């Protein structure tokens, strides 16, 4: 990813849900751009491979215990990153409910599932924004949410996931207006990419994954590091200094009317 080289050099970024999938790929891309990358994970040992990716790409990895449903943990992760590296330039909230890996018909959903999705996606989106705001204001930084096409057009057997991702999109639009005068940009990326959820689906319903892939004009699902990472880095860099309040759909052409 030579095009990213130096794009975030001297910058400090927090990526939540960085242990696997899109989060791992995005973290590696920020490493390739020269950033210090805080890897927010529930279990620090789970971030070992991601940390290696970041370091090999040319960045600096900082593993942080950061369960985004725990207010004290997320606050401590942000403060540790700032204390050790002096600043915070971007937050990428990528963490999702572990139950997003499950395809569930609406009639089989329950309140516990809803609360889990809401806690990780909606409440944590607000909480991370609140906790990072003074640091992002100091650096004229960026707040990036990892949304989903499901939050725009809906997804069968994922009603709660679709709902919370739609809420994130509205949050982006509102917060971009409010934080703009402070120099903070707020955007989201809606990727169609290889993820733990799709990997699980490939085992349980391979024909469904084949149908999804067949609908992508570019003929494949996105790679988290090389397809989703660069647009995410761009939106957090000075190259996107006049872009805010937007959702960038990165889907290989699958979703062209969103």
What are the language-model segments listed below?
Residues 2-4, 103, 153, 232-233, ...:
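Short C-terminal tail/terminal secondary-structure segment
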Residues 44, 65-77, 111, 226:
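The beta1-alpha1 cofactor-binding region of Rossmann-like NAD(H)/NADP(H)-dependent oxidoreductases
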Residues 181, 188, 207-243, 250-252:
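C-terminal helical subdomain
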Residues 12, 19-21:
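Conserved glycine-rich cofactor-binding loop
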Residues 102-106, 110-118, 212:
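Substrate-binding pocket helix/loop in short-chain dehydrogenase/reductase
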């Amino acid at each position: 990813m030579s095009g990213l080289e130096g794009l975030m050099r001297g910058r400090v970024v927090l990526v939540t849900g960085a242990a696997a999938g899109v989060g791992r790929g995005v973290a590696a891309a920020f490493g390739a751009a020269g950033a210090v990358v805080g890897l927010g994970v529930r279990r620090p040992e789970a971030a070992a491979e991601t940390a290696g990716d970041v370091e090999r790409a040319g960045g600096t990895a900082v593993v942080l215990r950061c369960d985004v449903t725990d207010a004290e943990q997320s606050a401590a992760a942000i403060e540790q990153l700032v204390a050790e590296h002096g600043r915070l330039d971007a937050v990428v909230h990528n963490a999702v409910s572990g139950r997003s890996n499950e395809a569930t018909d609406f009639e089989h959903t329950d309140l516990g599932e809803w609360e889990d999705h809401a806690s990780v996606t909606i409440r944590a989106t607000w909480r991370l924004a609140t906790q990072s705001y003074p640091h992002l204001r100091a650096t004229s930084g960026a707040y990036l949410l990892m949304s989903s096409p499901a939050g725009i057009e809906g997804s069968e057997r994922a009603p709660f996931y679709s709902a919370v991702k739609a809420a994130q999109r509205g949050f982006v639009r509102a917060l971009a207006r409010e934080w703009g005068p402070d120099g903070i940009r707020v955007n989201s990326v809606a990727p169609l990419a290889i993820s733990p959820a799709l990997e699980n689906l490939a085992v349980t319903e391979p024909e469904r994954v084949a149908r999804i892939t067949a609908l992508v004009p570019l003929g494949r699902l996105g790679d988290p590091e090389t397809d989703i990472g660069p647009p995410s880095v761009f939106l957090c860099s000075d190259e996107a200094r006049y872009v805010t309040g937007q959702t960038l759909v990165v889907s290989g052409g699958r979703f062209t009317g969103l």
